[in-house]
Amino acid sequence: DMVKGYDAVADGSADPSTLGITAVDDQTLQIDLTYDCPYFEEIMAFPATFPVRQDMVESSDNWTFDPSTYIGNGPYKMTEWSHNAYISMEKNENYYDYENLGPDTIKFTLLDDNNAMLKGYNNGELDFIENLPVDEIPTYLASGELEIGDYLGTYYVCFNTEDEVFSDPNIRKAFSLVIDRNYIVENVSQAGEVPADGYVPNGVNDAAGAGSDDFRTVGGSYYSISDEDYEANCEEARQLLADAGYPNGEGFPTITYSTNDAGNHKKIGEALQNMWQTELGVTVNLNNQDWNVFLQNRKDGNFQIARNGWIADYNDPCSFLDMWYTDGGNNDAQYSNPDYDAAIDAAKATSDPEERMKAFHEAEDILIGQDSVLAPIYFYTQPYMLNPDIDGMYYTPLGYFFFGYTSKK
């Protein structure tokens, strides 16, 4: 636990009064940590840590649905919410920088139809959209109207390491090597994603921080993502499978790939199925599930291979790597390796940037290079379209768009 006493309070074995969080006065919150956390300020900027009004939270279970009780401390406040239609906001007169804010009001239209979003943008009803039909992406990329922002996230395949078949790291590696990552980003997802040659994505800070080589650059590639090397990757994979007792896939049991049935996930699953069957000679069934059912099955370990993805909560490799610690809450792979745990412990035991990153690189080497627990497919990007008459919009690689200081020509 990062905050002193959290684990004991969370499991009910200690009184909440023992938690290492104290309101020193009306303006000061003191948080006692169990270790020196270099990214703590970034965590405090994460939405889950934002302050809320206690009286409003306790007034109703539906307090977030009513503009009169949905009270925050940001630059804009909600004035109207027509559910499944739009949310209207206006400048918050109590905001510390009120005088410098941009538009008096901002209206967010709620749509789940990508075609409707694009139509609304093209006819001038919408100034900004972050989704459009997949088959339209190449056209708008070519025209320069579609922007592609960096996004600190990775889409990957997760192996159940406790499954009888995928308990062998060499079999996991074989299944990873035959994934044609370039084909998937160019012909299936088509949103400017970057083929992944490791787990921690581009843009995550290394020891030297922002403006220097990032964690991925320093860590290098775990396999080649070059088109020219794809056949060599497949040859290596077939040899690994043969060494495991399955030459050309002979005798390999039928396996199941699990995914949810929304968006491109099913199409990516079909592409993976074809690659594994064609290159390894194995039989793969697809199990497309409702989102909530899929999440629960993956969490419970009721799968062999499953699609997965992770978006950073803060810009530090810890956001990606500590989740695979033995018995971690997000450790869907059911993975456990004492050497990996020791590397994570070492990273958390020091505040020295070089030592921290050395330990995190060692952890990724074990996770991907040695144990092949995951098969990274691509690094996320964030496509969006913005009215060229809008100035001052700010986007962060953590996936947040800020409109509070915008202006329209």
Predicted regions and their residues:
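Structural transition elements
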Residues: 195-243, 262-266
